Regions:
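Nucleotide-activated chemistry modules centered on ATP-dependent adenylation/adenylyltransferase
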Residues: 1-134
Length: 134
């Protein structure tokens, strides 16, 4: 059921970005929600299992410009992944950035683990993607 519904669901932060290229509403493929979606669906269903149409379908096809929206979020994830790899204990602190977790004190380690696993999913998705100013 989820696999069938995933193609008609919308995660993109700006699904009308493609209108300037004559495209309809669709996932851009490179914003934060699209990257998390792609990483999660690839983890769940394997490479090629995500039937979603993305404006930028292949993140590896060419270097992504970090001065443009296509490369900014990729580079941000690359920095975050490298930072967490160097200091894994940071996850326990970073989970508090969105807001208070005072009502979840007994679950902080589990929440930090969700954060780590989520970044690991994105890391697998963007492994080998080149993001730099062009």
């Amino acid at each position: 059921l989820l696999k069938n519904l995933a193609t008609v669901s919308l995660s993109c932060s700006s699904p009308t970005k493609g209108r300037w290229r004559g495209l309809g509403i669709q996932h851009c493929g490179y914003c934060l929600p699209c990257l998390i979606r792609r990483a999660a669906l690839t983890t769940a269903w394997g490479a090629g299992g995500d039937a979603t149409t993305y404006t930028v379908n292949d993140l590896h096809a060419q270097p992504l410009d970090t001065r443009e929206s296509t490369g900014k979020q990729i580079r941000s994830f690359q920095y975050a992944i490298a930072r967490l790899r160097a200091r894994p204990q940071l996850a326990n602190l970073l989970i508090h950035k969105p807001g208070s977790l005072a009502d979840e004190l007994t679950h902080l380690n589990e929440l930090a683990d969700v954060y780590r696993r989520g970044l690991a999913e994105v890391e697998r998705l963007i492994d080998g993607v080149e993001a730099r100013p062009s």
